[in-house]
A protein has these predicted regions:
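Selective recognition of signaling/oligomerization transmembrane alpha-helices
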Residues: 144-180
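Short loop-to-helix capping motifs
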Residues: 49-51
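Amphipathic alpha-helical segments and their boundaries
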Residues: 1-36, 74-92, 155-159
Length: 180
């Protein structure tokens, strides 16, 4: 019974780690999407000076920061991933200042300055670094997930063996009881 319980616990733990990896991948993609929506809204705000676009920019940028916080929390047990998230946090801090300058100009209806700052931000090398960091996070987590899938399959096989052994022992005990 203890063998069966331990095999079941190992399998449950493996499934939990798989779910954790999928969550990290999902949060990374959600962060990327929120950043893209924020930058698109800022572009519209810089050109059209519509306050609603400015609000969408602020909301999406804030959402991206929430995803970043979740990501920091979820990778803290993995030094390699935590280091990537730290670099990403630093890059996004600088990016936020850059985009904030463009948003401020748009807020004060300085169209030329807003467009110019937004355009400069669009050509900044930080975009490539941020994209690379996001891709690295996902690639690393997929590697971790593949290993976790292998462990889960092994744990599932161990659980099946324990169930089979437990069933055979139960059948043998029943036969002995009937024969006696």
């Amino acid at each position: 019974v203890l063998l069966l319980a331990r095999a079941n616990d190992n399998y449950d733990r493996s499934l939990g780690w798989q779910a954790h990896s999928l969550e990290v991948i999902s949060q990374t993609r959600s962060l990327d999407a929120a950043l893209a929506r924020a930058e698109a809204a800022l572009g519209r705000f810089a050109v059209g000076l519509q306050k609603e676009d400015g609000r969408v920019y602020e909301q999406q940028w804030g959402l991206s920061q929430q995803y970043l916080t979740l990501l920091q929390r979820n990778v803290r047990d993995n030094p390699k991933q935590a280091a990537l998230v730290k670099k990403l946090t630093d890059e996004l801090g600088r990016r936020g200042e850059q985009l904030g300058d463009a948003a401020l100009s748009a807020n004060y209806r300085q169209t030329v300055a807003a467009i110019s700052k937004y355009n400069a931000a669009g050509h900044d090398a930080a975009l490539i670094r941020i994209d690379r960091l996001l891709s690295d996070l996902i690639r690393n987590e997929r590697t971790i997930l593949a290993e976790r899938n292998r462990v889960a399959a092994s744990d599932r096989a161990n659980l099946n063996q324990a169930i089979l052994l437990f069933s055979l022992l139960g059948a043998a005990a029943a036969i002995i009881a009937i024969a006696a």
